[in-house]
Amino acid sequence: MYRSGERLLGSHALPAEQRDFLPLETTNNNNNHHQPGAWARRAGSSASSPPSASSSPHPSAAVPAADPADSASGSSNKRKRDNKASGGRAAGGGRADGGGVVYSGTPWKRRNYNQGVVGLHEEISDFYEYMSPRPEEEKMRMEVVNRIESVIKELWPSADVQIFGSFKTGLYLPTSDIDLVVFGKWENLPLWTLEEALRKHKVADEDSVKVLDKATVPIIKLTDSFTEVKVDISFNVQNGVRAADLIKDFTKKYPVLPYLVLVLKQFLLQRDLNEVFTGGIGSYSLFLMAVSFLQLHPREDACIPNTNYGVLLIEFFELYGRHFNYLKTGIRIKDGGSYVAKDEVQKNMLDGYRPSMLYIEDPLQPGNDVGRSSYGAMQVKQAFDYAYVVLSHAVSPIAKYYPNNETESILGRIIRVTDEVATYRDWISKQWGLKNRPEPSCNGPVSSSSATQSSSSDVDSDATPCKTPKQLLCRPSTGNRVGSQDVSLESSQAVGKMQSTQTTNTSNSTNKSQHGSARLFRSSSKGFQGTTQTSHGSLMTNKQHQGKSNNQYYHGKKRKHKRDAPLSDLCR
């Protein structure tokens, strides 16, 4: 089974003034910000610890103010230690060095990009391609679902188990949880009955099974004992499945949404601002915020595939980090989208009048405020504002004059992938990328239907212990990229098909540059134009920029790793 490493920063609070992310390079000059996880040493890794954990930024680089999320989230928090994407050593696509791989925190960056927002667009495309679910990751998750479903079917043979959330829509990160809903007929929700059965069958880690019976939607939270995938189980909740269908519909209308959402989810995840249970903004709320942004955005081409992702990302951060009035304004996406006055709408809420920092009307149930539990919305707002300042500076015309702009990552200034996440994905590829991966015998009995859908098992008849990363550890490699796969939701038959497509999806199409890219991003000295305030304090953007021709936007097609002619290097 997979076991993540100990948090070396767990007993040391991060300094309040620590900068968020320093300029990242593909050399080992910046790999000393975090020490490697302890599990790597237990696994026999020959990589030595970096010489220092307090590296300073490049002396010539202008670094904006510290990310407010750093000072507000101490690493002693257990939730943060459980988050593979938060803290830890940054992983990346570096060069091989001795017995290991040198990481830089940006494994998606395999080449130099154009300058400015065109380069940011290219990098967002590569990030999406790298972070999108791989076939073996979907296969692993389906096996987790099958194991849990077998326990549920043993208790209630007529129960119906369905997947919803990011796993159903395909917009999940490598460490995202799985959302399951169980439909059946019970007088009282059988939370504790299922909790006892999951413990009995050893499907989950003993300490990870928790029953949140007092929550708005009562759920069971657990961590799969073999894969460390987190699972939330609810009962008789219809809206979750309907919301997944709604997300798919909007994704078809706005092809840019998956690119924005994956970047934003990673941005919040590594700052521990993504859990509604702790006041953060959940995936559904974040998606609706992105939809509202695109609906009310001044660009007419926001719904066509070749929109510049870099421009949209920066303007998203500008809107929700700088201009949006969280105190007075609510978000509504029905009927083309609009802003609403919170004090008027909340009087008609299902739960009565409740002060809500972030009001987002549920399009499936207008009387429901899906953002009412996000009491940490102001902290998210500050993080968005920070990202806006950082990215605006990085794509400005003067950024090309900074040292090391040929190798530094623009997107890596606000997000990065930890060593732990990269190695976790390698472990998944090694386990589920094989044709005959042994089914873990230590997770209790699995139903015959689940066993049929999973790969064949070669585990010894005397219950050989499950293999762990200590036994299966391979050198981290992020060279092969697989595009996002749409999760099969009706059955797990698609799991077997994913294996045959694993090698065919690794090639990329050629990337084309467009003229006029220098005009894509408005000068930071002038600021973003065309914003007015409504009577309710919300940001309403005018149509000044709708007239821009589509050829001003970078054509967002996939690319090969190598280009025929060298282009301008990535700016800071």
From Swiss-Prot:
Pfam families referenced in this protein's UniProt entry, alphabetically: MTPAP-like_central, PAP_assoc
SUPFAM superfamilies per the UniProt record, alphabetical: Nucleotidyltransferase (SSF81301), PAP/OAS1 substrate-binding domain (SSF81631)
Residue spans of biased composition, Polar residues class: 25-34, 477-494, 522-553
Major localisation: nucleus
Region (Disordered): 1-105, 435-572
UniProt: ATP binding residues: 240, 265, 283-284, 368, 372
Keywords: ATP-binding, Cell cycle, Cell division, Cytoplasm, Isopeptide bond, Magnesium, Manganese, Metal-binding, Mitosis, mRNA processing, Nucleotide-binding, Nucleotidyltransferase, Nucleus, Phosphoprotein, RNA-binding, rRNA processing, Transferase, Ubl conjugation
Entry similarity comment: Belongs to the DNA polymerase type-B-like family.
Protein name: Terminal nucleotidyltransferase 4B
Protein source organism: Homo sapiens
Organism phylogeny: Eukaryota, Metazoa, Chordata, Craniata, Vertebrata
